[in-house]
């Protein structure tokens, strides 16, 4: 937004300072200001590394995060929206608690976050589906990072086409 644009030059370095003081490793701040709303506010659309004083930007926008003990590769440059939906943290925790001994279907899996939490929560088997081959590849990589390849199955398919097929299975 226009208001945030005016203060980000001061705010982002302070955010990095606070996170580093908390023991977080911060190598850069990647901005995703590539939404049409910015143009309505007279701002240009762009995405890229915010320059931090004395720092070279990372070579890649692919990063690893850990949430609830689960490791994720996240593409902040090209991933859907911000690359990871942070607001779903507690829903992913709930899935982990509910998955014990169950067979789970994760539709629209994206990074595989719900599927991974189900598998780590003790699901017997998890199938993760997304229409995007790129998303499925990222979800598969995240399963590998967490040692879950044997519990999970991945499919690149349109969920609405796949559901009738799955429903017909015994």
Task: Enumerate the language-model features and the residues they cover.
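A short interface-forming secondary-structure element
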Residues: 1-6
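Non-catalytic substrate-recognition/targeting regions of SAM-dependent transferases
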Residues: 9-84
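Rossmann-like S-adenosyl-L-methionine
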Residues: 55-170
């Amino acid at each position: 937004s226009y208001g945030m644009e005016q203060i980000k030059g001061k705010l982002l370095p302070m955010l990095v300072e606070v996170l580093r003081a908390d023991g977080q490793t911060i190598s850069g701040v990647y901005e995703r200001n590539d939404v049409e709303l910015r143009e309505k506010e007279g701002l240009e659309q762009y995405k890229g590394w915010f320059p931090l004083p004395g720092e070279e930007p990372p070579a890649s926008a692919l990063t690893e995060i850990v949430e609830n003990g689960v490791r994720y590769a996240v593409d902040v440059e090209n991933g859907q929206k911000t690359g990871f939906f942070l607001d779903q943290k507690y829903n992913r925790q709930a899935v982990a608690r509910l998955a014990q001994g169950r067979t789970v279907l994760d539709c629209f899996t994206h990074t595989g976050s719900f599927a991974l939490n189900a598998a780590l929560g003790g699901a017997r088997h998890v199938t993760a589906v997304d229409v995007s081959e790129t998303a499925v590849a990222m979800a598969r990589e995240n399963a590998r990072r967490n040692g879950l390849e044997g519990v999970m199955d991945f499919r690149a398919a349109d969920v609405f086409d796949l559901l009738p097929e799955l429903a017909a299975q015994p």
